[in-house]
């Protein structure tokens, strides 16, 4: 099951926004070169981010749907436009390394020219003067002081990142049409990720959009694995991890 807050965001096919789309390069061709056919949750995320009406996209997605992978793909697509700056935020240093490694793999796959690859600071600079920077919530001060075209919060619900975004990072989205993507499996209903997610369903926040996708949207999951998970996990645990349900834990 997939639930999208805004009716003009589709999940069954990639949408075209010829005039003001956020991702300037052809997405379909890029995905074809990677051999990727996006699942419905990934398609919804792409369409929501690409839609010029929305600046803030929240995606509550069950486990193993390729959310970190598609987030990194979107980050690199934006970086292919000269002088673009992308920030990939993670809860901690270890998780930021996953995105750093993914970016290196994508760069190698497309044989992009890199003029700086700083493993210590986790910054990659391409020959077109675009930068892809990794950051962690517990060291957010190290990534302020610059403007970003796209900020991606991966596994956002795993840590309290509200202050990191509102105080440190929201002011860095000062470019016209700069955007933020928050993506995670839920971790209860009384936290910042849930608050941001429900903004997408409110007319009070017209620039926000949200998506929730359960395990049914993952074509790679087997029915036998789902049956085993249901037997070995509590109902609340299963609903959170596989149904992307906010309401099972506080």
Tell me the role of every PLM-derived stretch.
Residues 2-250:
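Phosphate/NTP-binding elements of NTP-utilizing enzymes
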């Amino acid at each position: 099951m997939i639930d999208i807050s805004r009716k003009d965001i589709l999940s069954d096919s990639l949408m075209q926004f010829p005039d003001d789309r956020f991702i300037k390069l052809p997405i379909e061709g890029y995905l074809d070169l990677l051999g990727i056919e996006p699942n419905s949750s990934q398609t919804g995320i792409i369409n929501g981010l690409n839609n010029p009406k929305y600046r803030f996209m929240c995606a509550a997605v069950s486990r193993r749907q390729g959310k970190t992978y598609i987030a990194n793909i979107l980050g690199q697509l934006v970086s292919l436009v000269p002088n673009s700056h992308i920030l990939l935020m993670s809860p901690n240093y270890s998780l930021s390394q996953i995105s750093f490694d993914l970016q290196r793999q994508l760069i190698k796959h497309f044989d992009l020219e890199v003029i700086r690859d700083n493993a210590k600071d986790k910054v990659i600079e391409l020959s077109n003067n675009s930068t892809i920077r990794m950051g962690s919530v517990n060291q957010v001060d190290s990534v302020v002081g610059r403007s970003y075209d796209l900020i991606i919060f991966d596994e956002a619900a795993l840590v309290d990142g509200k202050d990191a975004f509102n105080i440190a990072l929201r002011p860095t989205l000062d470019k016209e049409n700069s955007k933020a993507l928050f993506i995670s499996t839920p971790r209860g209903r009384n936290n910042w990720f849930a608050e941001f997610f429900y903004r997408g369903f409110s007319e009070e926040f017209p620039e926000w959009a949200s998506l929730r996708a359960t395990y049914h949207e993952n074509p790679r999951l087997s029915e036998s694995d789902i049956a085993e998970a249901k037997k070995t996990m509590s109902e609340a645990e299963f609903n959170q991890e596989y149904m992307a349900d906010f309401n099972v834990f506080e």
